[in-house]
From Swiss-Prot:
Belongs to the ABC transporter superfamily. Phosphate importer (TC 3.A.1.7) family. This is Phosphate import ATP-binding protein PstB 1. InterPro entries: AAA+_ATPase, ABC_transporter-like_ATP-bd, ABC_transporter-like_CS, P-loop_NTPase, PstB-like. It is found in: Cell membrane. The complex is composed of two ATP-binding proteins (PstB), two transmembrane proteins (PstC and PstA) and a solute-binding protein (PstS). It comes from Bacillus licheniformis (strain ATCC 14580 / DSM 13 / JCM 2505 / CCUG 7422 / NBRC 12200 / NCIMB 9375 / NCTC 10341 / NRRL NRS-1264 / Gibson 46). It holds the Pfam family ABC_tran. The gene is pstB1. ATP binds at G45, P46, S47, G48, C49, G50, K51, S52. The keyword Transport applies. Part of the ABC transporter complex PstSACB involved in phosphate import. Responsible for energy coupling to the transport system. SMART domains: AAA. It is a peripheral membrane protein. GO terms for molecular function: ATP binding; ATP hydrolysis activity; ATPase-coupled phosphate ion transmembrane transporter activity. NCBIfam families: 3a0107s01c2.
């Protein structure tokens, strides 16, 4: 009987020879990387290595920074998003972003989650209610807030606010979720809830997460990319990366010799 061949996941992103400058500063240098569908890709590296810059290129949030120039290719589902004809609103609808600290709008819990669908034209009240409920269920927040949906979101705890922001990103029905250090401002219990949530969400979404926490990267990710001084040093299966990395600089970083 022949051996069963593992099915390789499709690559949602293919990044080829990506370079980025802030003015004269060369921040990303010849980045080549793929991000597989329905997996968690962890992006690690010391402060200033380019990891947050990189993740913001994936839905072109980086374009909000003045004097940014990019060359190369960022292919999302076969389309180079660096093409000037790309619809940025549609791209950011399909590639959501969650930042380091929960940043709910000064509105109700309901209005925070409904914000994205509304700006994308969803007006039917029943559909909007269903979309909000589904997003809150997906982030395991529904049972905690269903009786106070019209209360101020800023009254939630830090961990709840971060889950609310994830729900807000999910409400537009994205394919990809980008997370820039989403647990760095949270306590250990809230961090664990977010990690458990990410492992559940990868059944439906492709996730890329920037993290300074090596234990977190090893716990939740399928592949890990190590950045250093604007270069991608190594991208590998997470188990291999943390047990026998190919590059000595990767080993030095994950074992705490610098960073």
């Amino acid at each position: 009987m022949s051996a069963v061949t593992a099915v390789k996941p499709e690559d949602v992103y293919q990044i080829n020879d990506l370079n980025l400058w802030y003015g004269e500063h060369h921040a990303l240098k010849n980045i080549n990387l793929t991000i597989p569908e329905y997996e968690i890709t962890a992006i690690i590296g010391p402060s200033g290595c380019g990891k947050s810059t990189f993740i913001k290129t994936l839905n072109l949030m980086i374009n909000m920074v003045p004097n940014v120039k990019m060359t190369g290719e960022i292919s999302y589902n076969g389309t180079n998003v660096l093409n000037s004809k790309v619809d940025l609103v549609e791209l950011r609808k399909k590639v959501g972003m969650v930042f380091q600290k929960g940043n709910p709008f000064p509105q109700s819990i309901f209005d925070n989650v409904a914000y994205g669908p509304r700006i994308h034209g969803l007006k039917n009240k029943k559909e909007l209610n269903e979309r909000v409920e589904k997003a809150l269920v997906d982030v395991a927040l529904w049972d905690e807030v269903k009786d106070r949906l019209h209360s101020q979101a800023l009254g939630l705890s830090g961990g709840q606010q971060q889950r609310l922001c994830i729900a807000r990103a999910l409400a537009t029905n994205p394919d990809v979720l980008l997370m820039d250090e989403p647990t760095s401002a949270l306590d250990p219990v809230s961090t664990l809830k977010i990690e458990e949530l990410m492992l559940k969400l990868k059944e439906k979404y492709t996730i890329a997460i920037v993290t300074h926490n090596m234990q977190q990267a090893s716990r939740i990710s399928d592949q890990t990319a190590f950045f250093l001084m604007g270069e991608l040093i190594e991208c590998n299966d997470t188990v291999k990366m943390f047990s026998s990395p190919d590059d000595h600089r990767t080993k030095d970083y994950i074992t705490g010799r610098f960073g």
